[in-house]
Regions:
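Conserved SAM-binding motif I beta-strand of class I
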Residues: 223-228
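Non-catalytic accessory regions of SAM-dependent methyltransferases
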Residues: 1-111, 122
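S-adenosylmethionine
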Residues: 258-339
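S-adenosyl-L-methionine
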Residues: 230-276
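Conserved SAM-binding loop of SAM-dependent methyltransferases across substrates and taxa
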Residues: 210-222
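C-terminal catalytic and target-recognition region of SAM-dependent MTase-like enzymes
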Residues: 312-376
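Non-catalytic substrate-recognition/targeting regions of SAM-dependent transferases
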Residues: 78-99, 105-176, 183
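Conserved class I S-adenosyl-L-methionine
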Residues: 197-209
C-alpha cells in the first residue's frame, strides 16, 4: 500500500522565500535529472485525484472490548536529532535543508512556516534540490546545482549501511523521524534477550519501505518479517540487506497487501513480540487493493493486537499526512488494547534542527503522529 501525495501548500511565502525558491530552481549552473520512479512502500505518491476517483470504502469498525483500558502517557514528543549520517540543517519558507551522508539536500516541507535561520549561502551549498510541483502528479524532478550525481549513494545510520536514492517522488529511502522508534526497538530487543528461550524475538514490520527498520531489528538479534506492497521497495530493501552485511540474518521479505497478510497470520495462529506499522493515508496494494486510513485503520490495529504474543513488547503506529490530532490515534490504540494491560504513549515525532555541524540545536520540525503500546 502506498500513500497519498503531500498536501498542496496554500498561501504565499515571504519575499525572501520567493527569491530563494527562484534562485534554487533556476537552471543556471544546475542540471536536472529525472530518475525512474522509486516507490515508497506504504507511502507511494499518487495522482492528485486518485483518492477522489476511488469509490469510498466502507468503515471497518471494531466492537468494544471487555476489560480495563491501558494506562497512558501523553503527550510524549519523540525527538530525533543528529544520528550518524543524517541531520536537519535548517528549515523555513516551506523548505528543509538536510544532510544525508556527504550530500546536502533541499526538499519541500509544508510544516516549515517560519523563516530560515541560516544565510542563503548555506542553502546554496546544497548538492541536490527537489523542484517538482504537486501539479506534476508527484513526478517531481531533482536539480543538481554543482555536479551531476548518481541515482544512489551510500548512507549509514545506527550502524546499518544502506542506499540513499533520489526518487521521483522526492523521498530518499529513509524517514529519519523514525530513528526515535528504531532506537527504542533496538534497546527493547537487547534488554529482552533472555526471553528468547532458544528462539529469536519476532518483529513484524508492516509498510516496511526500504527495510532500514527491519535491518536494525535483525542486527539486534530479531527474526524479522518485512511486508510491503511495492516490488521496487522490496528490491531496494534486499539491496540494503546485502550492503549492510546482514545477509545471514533471518529476514523474510514479503511483497503483499498488509491487511491480507495479517489476516492470514491471524488464521494461521502466528504471533509476534513487536509490530511496527506505518500506514499511508491512501494507497493501493499490488493487486489493486484499496486502502483508506480512516476507514481501515481500526480493523488493521485490531488484527495487529490479535497476532501479538501475550507477553509482547510493543505495538507502534505512525500516521503521516492526516488531518487529525494525536488524540485520535491515541484513543484508538487505547481501545484496541483494552483488556491487554500495559501503557499507551502517544504524541508527535519531531526532528530538531542541528545547524551546519549537526550539534547546534534549533527549531523542532513536526513530521507525524504516533501511538505506541508497551507492557507495563
Amino acid at each position: 500500500m502506498m500513500s497519498s501525495k503531500p498536501q498542496k501548500r496554500r498561501g504565499k511565502p515571504a519575499e525572501k522565500g520567493q527569491q530563494r525558491r527562484k534562485q534554487r530552481n533556476s537552471d543556471a549552473g544546475g542540471q536536472t535529472v529525472k530518475h525512474q520512479s522509486s516507490q515508497r512502500g506504504g507511502r507511494q505518491d499518487v495522482a492528485p485525484n486518485a483518492e477522489k476517483r476511488t469509490r469510498q470504502a466502507e468503515p471497518q469498525w471494531i466492537a468494544m472490548k471487555e476489560g480495563a483500558r491501558p494506562a497512558e502517557r501523553l503527550p510524549r514528543i519523540l525527538e530525533s536529532v543528529s544520528a550518524d549520517g543524517f541531520h536537519l540543517i535548517d528549515s523555513g519558507h516551506g523548505l528543509k535543508l538536510e544532510q544525508y551522508g556527504n550530500y546536502r539536500i533541499v526538499r519541500p516541507e509544508a510544516q516549515a512556516l517560519w523563516p530560515p535561520l541560516l544565510d542563503d549561502k548555506v542553502w546554496q551549498s546544497a548538492d541536490a534540490i527537489f523542484t517538482g510541483d504537486t501539479d506534476e502528479d508527484g513526478m517531481g524532478r531533482w536539480r543538481f546545482p554543482h555536479a551531476a550525481l548518481g541515482e544512489t549513494w551510500p548512507l549509514e545510520i545506527m550502524g546499518i549501511d544502506f542506499l540513499g536514492r533520489f526518487t521521483s517522488f522526492r523521498h530518499v529511502g529513509i524517514f529519519p523521524e523514525q530513528i526515535a522508534h528504531w532506537q527504542w526497538m533496538r534497546d527493547v530487543l537487547k534488554a529482552n534477550e533472555q526471553k528468547k528461550r532458544g528462539e529469536p524475538l519476532k518483529v513484524l514490520n508492516l509498510f516496511g519501505y526500504t527495510g532500514v527498520a527491519s535491518l536494525v531489528a535483525a542486527a539486534a538479534g530479531a527474526a524479522v518479517t518485512h511486508v510491503d506492497a511495492s516490488k521496487k521497495a522490496i528490491g531496494w530493501a534486499r539491496e540494503n540487506q546485502a550492503l549492510s552485511g546482514l545477509g545471514d540474518k533471518p529476514v523474510r521479505w514479503i511483497c503483499e497487501d498488509a491487511m491480507k497478510f495479517i489476516e492470514r497470520e491471524e488464521r494461521r495462529g502466528n504471533h509476534y513480540d513487536i509490530i511496527l506499522t506505518d500506514p499511508p493515508k491512501f494507497g493501493r496494494g499490488p493487486n489493486g487493493e484499496v486502502w483508506h486510513l480512516f476507514e481501515h485503520l481500526p480493523r488493521m490495529l485490531d488484527l495487529c493486537r490479535s497476532i501479538l504474543k501475550p507477553d509482547a513488547l510493543g505495538l507502534v503506529l505512525t500516521a503521516y499526512s492526516i488531518r487529525a490530532s494525536f488524540y485520535s490515534v491515541h484513543e484508538l490504540m487505547m481501545e484496541t488494547m483494552r483488556g491487554f494491560g500495559g501503557i499507551v504513549e502517544s504524541g508527535e515525532l519531531v526532528i530538531r534542527e542541528g545547524g551546519e555541524d549537526g550539534k547546534t540545536p534549533g527549531r523542532a520540525l513536526s513530521t507525524s503522529l504516533y501511538a505506541r503500546w508497551v507492557p507495563a
